């Protein structure tokens, strides 16, 4: 177990699991830190600045985009690694407190669920209000969406971002500590800002954002499937759920993304509803259109996934500690 022994954060299950639980608790109680102190905002600022330096020709755009991504990812990884090295030399309680303050901004479960609930509240007031609120959450055109489609989009966003904002950062944290979580969050932020095909914000991102999109695909591959499994397990056991398990792979591959379809399909099957993007894909097409109660049920499923993930993380920390000793 020489390799494990070389990873200092696996030596103490208490530090690893304590940091995870405390970060989730602070997220639950307080939500996001102010933007000027938010590391994900800093990442976004760097990516926004870098985007202005990317040339237009495809080959140059790809090379410059890849270089800018690698520089940013390398900087955040090594800064996080050095911070973690210093913090692990402190007493355990100080290490947990400090690591929590650094891990928490990389997790955004409270913000995600609040935004999704806000869409439902706005939709209860009017369709236009629901569309306007949804536009803050998704990048798709919301102008022509029906009430059901607005709700579908909000629930889809909850499922997809449950992976991006909670499961995947924790997955990489459990494997590589703070550097792993920071590295993933940078990659996911880059994909959210650059990972498009065609025009967006006056620029063709087909080549400029290709590296960012593929990197996120690789880093999200395992966590997305873990999210799907946890969503399915979090549903109520029944014969219908058994059939849903059999349909999961088929439904998950209906989306263009190799990863986002998994948590979205799992959410659709667990709720028994239809989710989709008009003209692009439909998940669990035989399901009923979601009503307001389905949004609340989706949030409950998300809560169960977060708690299950924290429990799995604690068990993983104990296993790491035993293997490293």
Regions found by a protein language model. Give the residues of each.
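Hydrophobic alpha-helical transmembrane segments
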Residues: 1-183, 195-325
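Substrate/ligand-engaging "lid" and interaction regions
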Residues: 188
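Glycine-rich phosphate/dinucleotide-binding loop and adjoining beta-alpha-beta core of small-molecule
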Residues: 191-192
């Amino acid at each position: 177990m020489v390799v494990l022994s070389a990873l200092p954060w696996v030596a103490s299950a208490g530090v690893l699991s304590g940091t995870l639980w405390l970060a989730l608790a602070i997220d639950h109680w307080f939500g996001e830190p102010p933007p000027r102190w938010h590391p994900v905002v800093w990442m976004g600022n760097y990516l926004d600045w870098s985007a202005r330096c990317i040339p237009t020709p495809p080959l140059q755009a790809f090379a410059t985009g890849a270089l800018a991504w690698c520089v940013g990812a390398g900087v955040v990884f090594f800064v996080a690694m050095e911070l973690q090295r210093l913090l692990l030399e402190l007493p355990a309680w100080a290490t947990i407190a400090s690591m929590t303050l650094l891990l928490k901004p990389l997790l955004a479960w409270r913000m995600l669920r609040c935004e999704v609930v806000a869409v439902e509240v706005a939709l209860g007031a009017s369709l236009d209000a629901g569309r306007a609120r949804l536009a803050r959450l998704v990048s798709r055109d919301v102008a022509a969406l029906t009430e059901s489609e607005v709700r579908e989009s909000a629930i889809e966003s909850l499922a997809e971002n449950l992976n991006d904002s909670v499961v995947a950062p924790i997955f990489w944290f459990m494997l590589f500590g703070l550097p792993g979580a920071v590295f993933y969050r940078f990659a996911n932020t880059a994909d959210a800002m650059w990972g498009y095909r065609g025009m967006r914000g006056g620029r063709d991102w087909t080549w400029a954002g290709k590296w960012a999109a593929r990197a996120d695909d690789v880093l999200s591959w395992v966590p997305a499937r873990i999210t799907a499994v946890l969503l399915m397990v979090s549903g109520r056991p029944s014969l219908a759920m058994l059939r849903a398990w059999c349909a999961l792979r088929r439904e998950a591959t209906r989306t263009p993304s190799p990863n986002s379809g998994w948590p979205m399909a799992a959410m659709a099957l667990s709720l028994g509803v239809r989710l989709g993007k008009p003209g692009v894909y439909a998940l669990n097409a035989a399901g009923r259109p979601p009503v307001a109660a389905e949004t609340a049920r989706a949030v409950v499923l998300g809560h169960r996934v977060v708690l299950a993930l924290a429990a799995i993380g604690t068990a993983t920390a104990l296993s790491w500690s035993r293997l490293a000793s």
